[in-house]
Structure formats: C-alpha cells, structure tokens
Amino acid sequence: SNAYTKYHMNEVKVFYQKEDMWDVAHQIYGTKEKQMSSSFFIFNLPGEKKAEFINMIPFTPKSKQNMTAIMMARNDGDEYGKLVVYKFPKNKTVYGPMQVEAQIDQNSEIAKEFSLWNSSGTTYKRGDMFIIPVNNSIMYVEPVYLEASNQAIPEVKRVIVAYGDKIAYASTLD
C-alpha cells in the first residue's frame, strides 16, 4: 500500500510533478498518532452478491487529513489478490481518521470521561479504528480501553461510532 501512495497516478505530468501524492491514513492508537495498519473484514463489496474476506487500508492526500481513497484486497476464491480502489471525488470532503479523532476529542462528554479515567489511577487507550463503508458514506468505529496501573490486561470500556457529523459512544455496540 505504501507504493500505491505514489504509483496511483495515471497522468505523466501529475506523476512527475508529484501533484497527487497520498499518505496511508493516520489514527490515534493508545495515546499517540501512528500510521494505520490494514484492517480485515468480511464485507459485501458494491455490486457483489455475497460477502467476502477483505483487507482494507485508507489513504489521505499527502500532508492532509481528509480521506481520498480506500484500497481493498480481496482474499476469497478466484478473486484472491485482486485490489479494488475506491477514490472519493475531489469536490467532496470525506473526513479522514485524524479528523474523526479530533471530533472525538472535541466532544465534551467523551473528553470529560477521558479526563476522569486518567486521574483515577487508570489510563485510557484508543484501539484500532475501523473504517466501514456504509450507504455511500463512511462509518468509523473505535474501541476505548481502560487499563489499571496495577493490571496488564486492558478492558474495553467504550465503543465510539462516528458517522457523518454525529458521534455516539456506549459500553457496547448494542
């Protein structure tokens, strides 16, 4: 996927002038920003009749935070190894993972809870963010773990879901 950040360009001029470079999207993992790893899903690709096992990675424009594309690697049967790339229109802003992370940080209820957890002898850590295409849009799902200072095993405390401009969080997805 790192090679694709440069080699997705089809026009010679755009390629040589590096006008459309991409980055693999970033997220907050634990408490620090890092490049996202690919996620594995069982998912119905658009136009396909049955769900299949896919590997997915999101891209943002170089040094920007909005999402520009998602690459999916197919892993089932005759489709094994085929790559499918969904590019978002340049005239439509699709929030990238770090923009969603910022929305989470700006949510007063969530921020209050994070503060409380950090001051009571425990620390919260964000897990891997999942990016799920839904109805021509993107839904983000991120688990939040609570880790006691004397315990090595973190506990899932909340699940945050973001869709469009809306953010919800609860102890489960139910």
Question: Language-model segments: which ranges?
Answer:
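Accessory, solvent-exposed terminal regions and/or long lumenal/extracellular loops of proteins
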Residues: 1-174
